[in-house]
Amino acid sequence: LLSRRQRQMCIRDSTADAFVLRGAKIVYVDIRPDTMNIDETKIEDAITEKTKAIVPVHYAGVACEMDTIMDIAKRHNLKVVEDAAQGVSAYYKGKALGTIGDFGCYSFHETKNYTMGEGGALLFQDENYLEKAEILREKGTNRSKFFRGQIDKYTWIDYGSSYLPSDMNAAYLLAELEEHEKIDRKRMAIYNYCLLYTSDA
């Protein structure tokens, strides 16, 4: 997303690495103690003329106040990149987390709600980002076009990495997603149990 220095982001530190690697300057915004999410009332004070995006983290699958965040982004002409790493199958006012902003990111790391050991998914609203996403996924090459027969050879275009999961890992993830309602019920039962026995502490 960012490749020039001195651009700024409003973001949590656990999400910062991807932006720092592209030369962005990170601006931290404090959290709300009730949700552990970004405090939407403090975002505008952190915005400068160099700010390019707001990156809300839906901590533990609890939704940030996306209406307010999207309104701020619109007024300041900023992109919104949702870190929905823990937000698969979680919603904000009927909308799936990761599908509200310009971009959404899911994680399938072993510590997340649904896992294939590693990896994730990138969602975006504007289909013009599709080619860039494919290049990032294919080690910085236009290999996807080659496999579709759109070009006769592929080459390096930009930076990227090897983000393609193995068939086996994808099969693990698919099996979990097919059981998402059962998994969600179990997680909610554990949450309610913990809440019940810690509320008096």
Segment roles from a protein language model:
Residues L1-L2, L78, L177:
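Generic leucine side-chain signal with a strong bias for well-ordered alpha-helical environments
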Residues R5-A84, Y91:
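PLP-dependent aminotransferase-like
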Residues L2, K95-G98:
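Short glycine-biased active-site loop of nucleotidyltransferases that positions the nucleotide triphosphate
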Residues L1-R7, I11, Y197-A201:
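Single conserved hydrophobic/aromatic residue that forms the stacking wall/gate
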